[in-house]
């Protein structure tokens, strides 16, 4: 795996840490250490899945990215490409101009939304429980939930 992909994955883990810090749940050193270790584990597990190619990727997603790459990127959105929603096709058009492998960019995009989902659930739990430990538990339960992890890191679904 390209070092740039590893750095992008680490940046997503860093974003998760910043979100936890800004939510005020990392005020105790023990919480910071625990969160850092759990984030490292969550993102290492995701990193181990990144090389896996699904038939959805090989038969559709990479074909669509190649279409965008050869037909002018965003300009190709005028043509009928794929059967996904327009925002996701726009993302595919945007990454078509990158020199990074599209498999990893697609999965990193999905992993980004794992963090958004975990943060959102943490915020929801915070409406009912004020204690940081409950919020952290909600965040990490979502981040480690098998379907969440497999959907993004292994299957590349958003």
Q: Where are the predicted features?
A:
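Membrane-water interface at transmembrane helix exits
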Residues: 20, 24, 45, 49-50, ...
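Membrane-interface micro-motifs in multi-pass membrane enzymes
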Residues: 1-7, 85, 149-158
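Loop-to-helix entry region of an early transmembrane alpha helix in multi-pass inner-membrane enzymes
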Residues: 2-9, 86, 100-119
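Transmembrane signal-anchor helices characteristic of membrane glycosylation enzymes that use polyprenol
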Residues: 4-59, 111, 144-146, 150
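Transmembrane-helix motifs of polytopic, lipid-linked glycan transferases
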Residues: 15-20, 105-129
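Membrane-helix interface segments
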Residues: 30-31, 104, 130-137
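Short hydrophobic/aromatic helix or loop-helix immediately within or flanking a transmembrane segment
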Residues: 60-70, 75-105
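Membrane-embedded helix bundles of polyisoprenyl
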Residues: 42, 134-158
């Amino acid at each position: 795996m390209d070092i740039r992909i590893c750095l992008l994955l680490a940046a997503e883990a860093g974003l998760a840490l910043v979100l936890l810090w800004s939510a005020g749940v990392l005020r105790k050193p023990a919480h910071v250490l625990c969160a850092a270790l759990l984030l490292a584990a969550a993102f290492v597990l995701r990193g181990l899945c990144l090389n896996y190619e699904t038939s959805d990727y090989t038969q559709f997603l990479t074909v669509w990215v190649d279409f965008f790459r050869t037909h002018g990127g965003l300009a190709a959105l005028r043509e009928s490409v794929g059967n996904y929603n327009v925002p996701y096709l726009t993302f595919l058009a945007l990454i078509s101009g990158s020199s990074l492998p599209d498999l990893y960019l697609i999965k990193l995009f999905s992993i980004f939304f794992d963090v958004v989902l975990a943060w959102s659930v943490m915020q929801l739990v915070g409406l009912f429980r004020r204690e940081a430990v409950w919020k952290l538990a909600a965040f990490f339960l979502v981040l480690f939930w098998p379907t969440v992890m497999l959907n993004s890191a292994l299957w590349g679904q958003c």
